[in-house]
């Protein structure tokens, strides 16, 4: 009898052990399944996060590319000259910080044949003294400073500082061979021919430069309608730059019909800039780079 009871007890114990083992196994597999599900879910979340990050980066790059392309329509007139003294590193730095990659230089030549950057033919307005650049030696010009202590820049100074990180919209204030030759020397020395839009009020300078730099865009600056119409007939003129009183849809269309880009100067009010954008102007000069780029984003290619 005791033997029978012992067998029963042993059987019960075995049953319980097996049951517990089965239960433990079930728990193990459930935990394993749960763990696998958690890992799969975590991987899915990580993949979603990765895809979202990639989409955000792609969107950021697209926005950055669009902003860059829109800024290409904006020529920073003498740098950010509404905020800093014109044609100084401070003015150029500010324009670039505002999103510009097209900064303007006006070139004058010294008695020593060096190209300096100044809108005026004399240094009086910017430096308060000096006289005509063409009558001053390099050492005399180098001794001059602006009202806030900045030096009068050479074209080579600007190339040294910015290199090929920006485009240079360079106006020759004279079409004489001395200025044109000096310009070529500096451009060739720094290998900048692909970084420049050259502009002049006189066609002869542009014609002379066409021989040396056929692929360099040439901008003819015009102040009256007859000059505008005449400029359209010149094959070496790539861009017609009009004073803003000549900025109109009809002139813009004429330029495009002749295979020329249409440019206007100098636009500073919102209405002027918006008008240029809406009529399809390819570029324009402004003293307010940051505002112009904002308006480009809002109105360029906006069909409403």
Predicted regions and their residues:
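Phosphate-group recognition and catalysis centered on beta-loop-alpha active-site segments
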Residues: 2-304
């Amino acid at each position: 009898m005791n033997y029978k009871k012992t067998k029963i007890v042993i059987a019960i114990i075995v049953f319980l052990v097996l049951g517990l083992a089965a239960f433990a196994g079930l728990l193990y597999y459930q935990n394993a399944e749960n763990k696998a599900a958690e890992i799969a879910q975590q991987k899915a979340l990580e993949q979603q996060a990765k895809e979202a990050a990639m989409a955000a980066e792609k969107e950021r790059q697209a926005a950055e590319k669009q902003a860059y392309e829109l800024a290409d329509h904006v020529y920073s007139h003498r740098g950010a000259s509404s905020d800093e003294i014109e044609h100084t590193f401070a003015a150029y730095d500010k324009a670039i910080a505002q999103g510009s990659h097209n900064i303007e230089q006006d070139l004058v030549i010294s008695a020593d044949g060096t190209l300096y950057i100044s809108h005026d033919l004399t240094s009086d307005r910017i430096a308060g003294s000096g006289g005509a650049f063409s009558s001053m030696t390099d050492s005399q010009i180098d001794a001059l400073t602006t009202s806030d202590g900045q030096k009068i820049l050479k074209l080579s100074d600007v190339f040294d500082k910015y290199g090929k990180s920006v485009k240079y919209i360079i106006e020759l204030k004279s079409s004489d061979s001395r200025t044109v030759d000096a310009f070529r020397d500096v451009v060739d020395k720094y290998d900048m021919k692909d970084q420049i839009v050259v502009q002049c009020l006189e066609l002869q300078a542009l014609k002379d430069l066409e021989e040396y730099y056929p692929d360099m865009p040439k901008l003819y600056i015009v102040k009256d309608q007859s000059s505008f119409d005449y400029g359209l007939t010149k094959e070496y003129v790539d861009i017609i730059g009009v004073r803003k009183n000549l900025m109109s849809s009809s002139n813009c269309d004429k330029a495009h019909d002749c295979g020329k880009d249409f440019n206007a100067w100098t636009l500073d009010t919102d209405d002027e800039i918006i008008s240029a954008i809406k009529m399809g102007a390819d570029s324009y000069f402004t003293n307010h780079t940051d505002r112009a780029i904002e308006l480009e984003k809002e109105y360029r290619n906006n069909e409403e």
